[in-house]
């Protein structure tokens, strides 16, 4: 399968740099997986698409202000993007500098260079940093960090992004990118969904910077997926099994919820799904057999990305690429701050061939 098969033309003008004034005020492109039929609407149409007893599964990770600027004590500017918090004082981070720091290098971080840190070790492409500070990592980042907006949002982060680039139900800090499908849910919509009898459950997947890394191989099967930490607790397992037992749909809010649920299903030895607390590097592309997810709420993804491959595996390759072409023609807004899709699973997708 060629990565190039998942390319599409996207005008720069359709990349959203700010969200809509109202979270639920975005547009919604509905794709019926089995038929390929498209329907244009607004996000609150989700209420009409869901039935009492359906289960919405959200990712409750919280984005941390993971980007810091500073310099080496010895000189030279540096940019740090925290990928994973190891403990109260240590992190794994991506580091950009004219010359990579060696172990033992002292750093001054923050716009006012008030945070002292030391590079203690290197792990492949990541650097282990220790903060020489009484405060814990999260307190430091909240004080001096910048929100890590995606590379395609070509502007500096603003104070408003601390709220806007965060779901209203975010709870567990650790992500360096938002689970963006969830950004469209506001409290009135969540209340209306509950009133209709829609069940809700929460997984955690701390989205890493790897989610923005391009696929650098020509054939999909050669791609090595980055690892992210995920939690699917027992209450989510119980909710999924109860939903299936009553003949209703498990609806994943975002590709991170999909990857969490399907990771838990793949790791389960006997039942459909079992609790999961581990790193996952699951890579879902056409041919994958979905075990848990029946419908999906998701944003529009980058050309040739692993996420458009995941959607193609869910809705069918031809359905997905046609939907994206129509979204461009109808001037939907793309990527993290853009519009959304509601997709029902196409059971024939895994048999479909990919390409022209």
Swiss-Prot record:
Pathway: tRNA modification; tRNA-queuosine biosynthesis
Domain of life per record: Bacteria
InterPro entries per record: QueA (IPR003699), QueA_dom1 (IPR042118), QueA_dom2 (IPR042119), QueA_sf (IPR036100)
EC number: 2.4.99.17
Swiss-Prot/TrEMBL GO biological process terms: queuosine biosynthetic process; tRNA wobble guanine modification
GO molecular function, one term: S-adenosylmethionine:tRNA ribosyltransferase-isomerase activity
Reaction(s) the record says it catalyses: 7-aminomethyl-7-carbaguanosine(34) in tRNA + S-adenosyl-L-methionine = epoxyqueuosine(34) in tRNA + adenine + L-methionine + 2 H(+)
One Pfam family matching this protein: Queuosine_synth
GO cellular component, as recorded: cytoplasm
Subcellular compartments: Cytoplasm
Keywords from the named record: Cytoplasm, Queuosine biosynthesis, S-adenosyl-L-methionine, Transferase
Subunit architecture: Monomer.
Biological function: Transfers and isomerizes the ribose moiety from AdoMet to the 7-aminomethyl group of 7-deazaguanine (preQ1-tRNA) to give epoxyqueuosine (oQ-tRNA).
The family this protein is said to belong to: Belongs to the QueA family.
NCBIfam families found in the cross-reference section: PRK00147.1 (NF001140), queA (TIGR00113)
Name recorded for this polypeptide: S-adenosylmethionine:tRNA ribosyltransferase-isomerase
Gene name of the encoded protein: queA
